[in-house]
Amino acid sequence: MAAVTQAEDSSITPELSVDALLKLANVVRFRIYVALRAFGTLRARQLAELTGITETSMNRHLDVMREVGFVVAEQAGKTRQSWLWSAVPGGVRVGRIEGGEIQDAALEWLRAVSGAYGIIASQWPSVAASWPQNWQSAAETSDWVMHLTAQQLDGLAADLRAVATKWKQASKINEPALAEQTVTPEDPDWIAPVVLILTAIPYPSRPR
């Protein structure tokens, strides 16, 4: 299995085990993880609204994710409803894996990642019209079908990561202002979480 990274540039990454991967291999849990990375600190109620599940179910998912070390809770009040949840820095990292139970678990996790990002991407067309025109114009959904060697695909992936890394630096500059911004979405200086999904894979099957 080729190296896969879903991570911030940080050394704070919990150790992955078969058990941890299987517990993270859940579409809802990965959507929770993406939401926390996008918005920072949220309560279970807010996460439940973003993912379309009940707050009770959300708390169960958060408990599992906290058990394997990928979310943390700040107990900001006496009741659980007031707890503030955040994703740990470091992301979820899956390196080069060869065979065995860990590979099977990693594949399950990758399927959950693909499913979660598919849901997020599919939500944009339904809400795009409610966004200001400049954001509608800036949003990008494109696809290409290419014919490449494995070495060329490796080069393409490296180029895409380099471009993403460049803009991640801009994101880090913006992040301190995100929580305190007072401008509205119509203002050109407004900052929003942006999800970039990179998938460059061989077509999964071949005609017989």
Place the predicted regions along the sequence by residue.
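Residues within the helices of the helix-turn-helix
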Residues: V34, A44-R45
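Amphipathic alpha-helical dimerization/coiled-coil segments
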Residues: S86-M146
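A short acidic, leucine-rich amphipathic alpha-helix
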Residues: Q46-L50
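Short, cationic-aromatic polyanion-contact patches
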Residues: A20-V28, R43, A76-G99
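Charged, low-complexity intrinsically disordered regulatory/assembly segments
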Residues: S130-R208
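Beta-hairpin "wing" of winged helix-turn-helix
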Residues: V68-G77
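Short, hydrophobic-biased segments on the C-terminal half of alpha helices
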Residues: L62-D63
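Key DNA-contact positions within bacterial/archaeal DNA-binding proteins
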Residues: T56
